[in-house]
């Protein structure tokens, strides 16, 4: 019976040491490794209304306070990820701006879609109007445009992606399916729906890792 009791000696100090580790140095299985890329891309998932945007707004602000270059990208058709940083105001979305520029015969520039507040760079991918298109396809189109703008050459320390996890659409699973992110963070609570969503995302991560993917689950925020 005694052997079944976990050793809790110095448990608190070990947790503190782990919490102080750089996210880039922690594998999904807990082993330490070298960062695979200079810019660490972290995707956050969870059911709608669980607090993903609130969590990321605070996380990105604290990272900026620590001197990190942080880009926060809202990948939800509601386009409300960055509103907390901008005092409740919505940023012009990439999809909306791209459509207007295309109709005017102009090209989209980075200054049209990327904004800065409190040291955090932020943008919203956006999505189609209700009943007028596919939200997942809008996400894919948004990232294609970001790649044309040199997304991978912007020299950020961290890029934080805010995704809703209620759907199984491939567009919203882009960071996992295409190995765009190094880590996934889940936001959940004690209700069954949020745990169901978290479990689905973990299953997707496991599936693509079996196919050779490198995305891992960094942790769970309750």
Located regions from the model:
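Nucleotide-state-sensitive switch-loop elements of NTP-binding domains
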Residues: 38-42, 65-69, 75-163, 167
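Short amphipathic alpha-helical segment that frequently serves as the phosphate-/nucleotide-binding helix
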Residues: 53-57, 139, 202
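Short strand-loop junctions, especially beta-strand C-caps/beta-turns
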Residues: 47, 125-128, 189
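Short beta-strand/turn micro-motifs at beta-sheet edges
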Residues: 30-31, 109-112, 172-175
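Extreme N-terminal, non-catalytic leader segments
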Residues: 1-50, 54-71, 104-107
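Short acidic, glycine/serine/threonine-rich loops at helix termini
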Residues: 55, 82-85, 172-173, 198
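Conserved catalytic-core segment of NTP-binding enzymes
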Residues: 7-9, 14-16, 148-154, 158, ...
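Loop/helix-junction capping segments adjacent to catalytic residues or to phosphate/diphosphate-binding pockets
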Residues: 53, 132, 192-195
């Amino acid at each position: 019976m005694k052997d079944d009791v976990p050793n809790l000696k110095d448990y608190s100090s070990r947790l503190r040491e782990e919490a102080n580790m750089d996210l880039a140095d922690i594998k999904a299985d807990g082993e330490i490794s070298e960062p695979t890329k200079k810019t660490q891309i972290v995707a956050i998932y969870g059911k709608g209304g669980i607090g993903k945007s609130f969590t990321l707004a605070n996380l990105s602000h604290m990272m900026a306070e620590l001197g990190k270059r942080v880009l926060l990208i809202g990948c939800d058709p509601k386009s409300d990820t960055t509103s907390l940083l901008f005092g409740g105001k919505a940023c012009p979305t990439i999809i909306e701006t791209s459509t207007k520029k295309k109709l005017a015969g102009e090209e989209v520039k980075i200054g049209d879609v990327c904004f800065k507040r409190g040291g955090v760079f932020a943008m919203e991918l956006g999505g189609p109007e209700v009943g007028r298109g596919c939200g997942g396809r809008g996400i894919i189109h948004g990232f294609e445009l970001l790649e044309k703008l040199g997304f991978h050459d912007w020299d950020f320390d961290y890029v934080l992606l805010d995704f809703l996890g209620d759907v199984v659409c491939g567009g919203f699973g882009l960071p996992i399916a295409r190995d765009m992110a190094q880590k996934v963070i889940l936001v959940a609570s004690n209700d069954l729906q949020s745990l169901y969503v978290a479990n689905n995302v973990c299953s997707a991560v496991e599936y693509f890792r079996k196919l050779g993917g490198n995305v891992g689950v960094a942790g769970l925020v309750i």
